[in-house]
Amino acid sequence: MRNTHNPNETEASEDAENDTQSESDLSFDHGSSEKLNRASLPKTQNSAIPQSNALNTTPNESTSQIDSSPKIPSAVPHISTPNPSSGASTPNIKRVSDFKFGEILGEGSYSTVLTATENSTKREYAIKVLDKRHIIKEKKEKYVNIEKEALCILSKHPGFIKLFYTFQDAHNLYFVLSLARNGELLDYINKLGRFNEICAQYYAALIVDSIDYMHGRGVIHRDLKPENILLDDNMRTKITDFGSAKILNSSHGSHEEDTHHADKPQAHSRSFVGTARYVSPEVLSDKIAGTASDIWAFGCILFQMLAGKPPFVAGNEYLTFQSILHLSYEIPPDISDVASDLIKKLLVLDPKDRLTVDEIHQHPFFNGIKFDNTLWELPPPRLKPFGHTSVLSLSVPNASNKHENGDLTSPLGVPSMVSASTNAAPSPVGTFNRGTLLPCQSNLEEENKEWSSILQDDEKISKIGTLNVYSMSGINGNDAFRFFSSLFRKRKPRTFILTNFGRYLCVASDGEGRKTVKEEIPIKSVGMRCRMVKNNEHGWVVETPTKSWSFEDPNGPASAWVELLDKASSISLPFGNHSVTSFSRSIARSAV
């Protein structure tokens, strides 16, 4: 698949040209973020990524400026946006209607990633949809710009997901990205159990070459893990998810002086980024997460490819941190001495003593590997499990045990880019932020008992009712409203439960009393909107980018549901999926 821009695209309409900008328009300005509201935003804005200009732009008069422009030295080639004043023709302004959206690949607190096909070219992409409301509410504007800037800086290397277009509408930001069809590296580790050393050597070489390029351009990822390493059509790696990154000398990133040693103490106000099982010991000690932190994570990934699990695994994050800070891990005895030696030299407590990228290149584990342009031309070895000769099919994995090692989203809450959607295993320490739960009604004790089999521990019913519902896929909610009255007779009565955990469930009971969840309405997904239906006090609509639901409560006002649904959509997600809390880190440090 060649994801290149068509230079022969027709010129945009006059209205679209008025919104055209010489650079991208998705940046935020912390000082003016309060001005970013749905009334002040244009209907649609867009730009293709310029070849040599920055991604940020000076918006037109109808839009609040939402960031100062960082200057980015490199960008996606062959995609440019001429300055409208230059007299050059302007490429089509991208809009949601230019793409046909497919399956959801991943969801996070602030974003959803979907497959999409461009209508005019039939090219397939992964489009990340980021909710402006949540980004501003949670003050995550900086991380949007960091991810965008990092993707642009790294666009000329084959080891990274590429950003092709950016555009926005009144509610969402859209990143049009390359689609890595073969999912996450973690899927294959889970399916094989362990890689043999030939496979591990090849994929480790690709990863370390990408790290070398990334660090050479002043980008520190800070959340490297198998979930953030994707595989393209040719089974070569693509690093993704730069929402946690630090870009040196960036107007959006930190201006701290970075060294390979990363041994300077930091203020406690510094936010943690990363995933518990891959976090470096210097981060747990409140020191700078420098380039050596990525080297530590690379050591964890190499260990996991060869051993089948991360080196630091414990029942909860406190014990995981203790294992990291005490360097408590065991290398399986059947791993070769040369591979064991490399792992030991990567997983070193003091970042000053870890191998540098150049030293990794020279390690005997990579004998026969040339770290030059030819590396990415080598055919990937057929995946084989450790100690076996069977070969894994290169079809897209059906990894039902995906994420059994836990996952922590970046400060954006951004999901993995292009992995197949699967169910995460429950965390041993999963809890909710109790202060944000919906209220429970005291008169629903019988209902709580009746439906207890489908409720989670400590989960209670906040509201229950029999609703008339109609759903439709692939239709914009505004268009859907035109059909609601005529389609009302087709709506089906269903029992819906809204829980204090913020889950909106369509439930059913069969003739034998067995309870099942027929569907969970994704009210926490990015771009979700819930609103009343005009001229119908009993009706409301829930809209997501790919599906809309029309509800009617014949026995009560819609406002009672809408108010609770709005509150439920912002309830904190469980942080038990191996995310790092400051409380656990402080205990771990004090115990060393």
From Swiss-Prot:
Keywords: ATP-binding, Cytoplasm, Kinase, Nucleotide-binding, Phosphoprotein, Serine/threonine-protein kinase, Transferase. The modification Phosphoserine is found at residues 64, 69. The keyword Nucleotide-binding applies. Residues 11-22 have a biased composition (Acidic residues). The keyword Cytoplasm applies. Residues 1-10, 42-68, 80-92 have a biased composition (Polar residues). GO terms for molecular function: 3-phosphoinositide-dependent protein kinase activity; ATP binding; phosphatidylinositol-3,4,5-trisphosphate binding; protein kinase activity; protein serine kinase activity; protein serine/threonine kinase activity. Belongs to the protein kinase superfamily. AGC Ser/Thr protein kinase family. PDPK1 subfamily. This is Serine/threonine-protein kinase ksg1. It comes from Schizosaccharomyces pombe (strain 972 / ATCC 24843) (Fission yeast). The lineage of its organism: Eukaryota, Fungi, Dikarya, Ascomycota, Taphrinomycotina.
